[in-house]
Amino acid sequence: MYRRSYVFQARQERYERAQPAGPTAQPGGTAPGLAALQALGERVAAQVQRARALQQRHAGLRRQLYAFQRLGEQPGPEEALARHVEANLQRARDLAAEHARLERQEAEAQRALDEFRSKYENECECQLVLKEMLERLNKEADEALLRNLHLQLEAQFLQADISVAKDRYKKNLLEIQTYITILQQIIQTAPQVSLVTGGMREEKLLTEREVAALRNQLDEGREAVTHLQAQKAELQAQTTALEQAIKHAHECYDDEIQLYNGQIENLRKEIEEAERSLERSSYDCRQLAVAQQTLRNELDRYHRIIEIEGNRLSSVFIETPISLITPSHGASLSLGSNVKDLTRAVQDITAAKPRQKALPKSLPKRKEIIAQDKVDETLEDAPLKTLQEPKAVQGELTGDGDSQLGAGGGHEVSPTQEGGPEDVPDGSQISKAFGKLCKVVKERVSGHKEPVPEPPADLFTKGRHILVTGESSFVDPEFYSSSIPARGGVVVSIEEDSMHHDGHVEPSPGQPMPPVENGQGVPQGREGAHSNHQQVTDKNGIRAKEPKDLEEKDDDSRKDDEAGRRPCPVIIPGPDGPSTTHSQTSGSNQGGPEGPGSKSSSLLAKSPSKALSFKKV
C-alpha cells in the first residue's frame, strides 16, 4: 500500500511539474506576474498533497506496526490469523475508500485540466490576436514615419522655393520701382497733349490699314486651308485605294513569292552541294595527280629493278641446261590459263636475292648497266630512221647478230665466271622457280591452242608493292588512261597485232650489238669498235649478255652512276613473245660445249623475225 501510494504521488508530482511549463513556454507572455502566482499556488498545492500522502503512509505504517505487535502478543495462531484477516479486511475497506477518494480527485483534476486547457487556448488566441495587432501597428507606424519623412522633405523643398520666390519678388519689385521712376521722369519731360493726340490718330489710321490687310490675308489663308483640306481628303482616298491594291497584290503574289523562295533555297542547296562536290573532285584530282606521279616513280623503279634482275639472271638462264623443249620453227603456243603460273614463276625467279648482300657488286652487273646506257642512247636516235626502213633494219639486225655471234664463238667467258663466287644467287629459290617454269613450259608446249584475248587487268599500287589482278597474257600491252579513272590504279589494255607470214614485220629500232674484239679480223666501224660484249634482245624482254673485254673496266665506275639517273627502256613483247622466249632459251641451253657465239647464232636461226615494240618510260 505504501509503495503504490508513493508511486502514484510521484507520478502526480511529475505531471504537475510538467503542466505549468506550457503557458510559461509561450513567447510573448503578457502577464508574467499572474503566471508566477499560478506557479506558486500549484507548488503549494503539490506540497500539501505530498504532506497528506505522507500522513496517510505514516498512519498505515503505524497500523501495521500495531497489528504486528498484537500478533506477537497473542498466544493462539487462530486468533492471530483471524485478527490478521480482520486487519486485511479493514485495510481493503480503507483502500476502497481511498480509491473512491482518488477517483473523485481524478475527476476534479480532469475538470481543472479542461478548464486550464480552455484558458490556455483562449490565452493563445489572445496572444495571436495581440501579435497580429502589434505587427499591424508596427507597419502603420513605419508607414507614418515614412510619410512624416516625405512631408519633411517636401517642407524643406517648399521652404527653399519660398526663399527663392521671395528673392525673385524682391528683385522684380526693385525693377518695377526703377521703371516707375523712369516713367515719371519721361512724363515730366513729355511734349504737349495735342502732339500726343495727333500722333495717336496717325497711329490709329495705320493700325486700321494694317488690320484690313491682315483680314484680307486671313481670308486668303482660309481659302487655301479649305483647298488643302479638299486635296488632303482626295489624297487620303487615293492612299486607301492604293493600300487596298497593295494588299490585294500581296495576297495574290504571296504564293508565288513562297514558291520562288523555295526554288531559291533549292538552288542555293544545289550550289552548295556542287561546291562541295567540286572541292571533293579537286581534292580527288590532286590525290590522283599525286598517285599518278607516285605510280610513275614506282613503275620507273620497278622497270629498273626488273631490268637489272633480268640482266643478272640471264647468265643463269644461259648456263642452266634445259633439254626438255624442242619446238618446231613455226609452232604456235597457247596463251591460256597457264600464263598466270608462268608469270608467277618468272616473278619467283626475279625475286631471288644474293646471299652475300654485304659484298661489292660483281663485274657483270656493272657491264649490264653500261649496256643499258648504250641502249638508251640508241633508242633516242634510231626510232624515226627505223620507221622509214623497217626491212633494212631487220636485215641488219639479223646479219650483225650472226656475224658477231660467229666471231665470238671462240671467246667463251661467262658472266658467272667473271663474277666469281662473290655474287651467287639463292640456289633453292632459283631451283624451285626453274621447276615451276619447266612445268609451265611443258604444259604450254604440249597443247596447240589459239591465243585467247584476255580481259584488261588493273594494276594497283599499295605501299612499295604492285598487286596484279586478273589473268594477263603475253600479248602486246599498252598503258592508257580510262574515261573513268580508278583511284590509285593503272588500267592496262591488251591489243593483238596480226603477224604477216610474207616477211613484212612491224618496224622497230635496231639494238646495238657490241662486237667481240678477239683479233680474228672482224670488220671495223660500229660493229668492231667494241667487240668484247654481245647483247641479244628477244621478244619478251630477256637479254642474253656476254662479258666484254677487260679493257673497258676503267669506264665501269663512271657509267654505273649514270645508269641510275637515265630512264630505262621497257621492251614489250609482241603476240608470239612466249614461244620465241622459250625456243631461244632451249636453243641456248642445248648448245652443249659450244661457245656463247654459237648458242646465240642457233637462237637467232630458230627464232622467226618478229617485231619489237619499244615504249620509253
UniProtKB/Swiss-Prot annotation:
Protein name stated in the entry: Filensin
Bias (Polar residues) ranges: 578-588
Region (Linker 1): 69-77
Domain IF rod: residue ranges: 33-313
Role played: Required for the correct formation of lens intermediate filaments as part of a complex composed of BFSP1, BFSP2 and CRYAA. Involved in altering the calcium regulation of MIP water permeability.
Family: Belongs to the intermediate filament family.
Biased composition (Basic and acidic residues): 540-565
Sites of N-myristoyl glycine lipidation: G427
Region (Coil 1A): 34-68
Region (Coil 2): 195-313
Phosphothreonine modifications at: T580
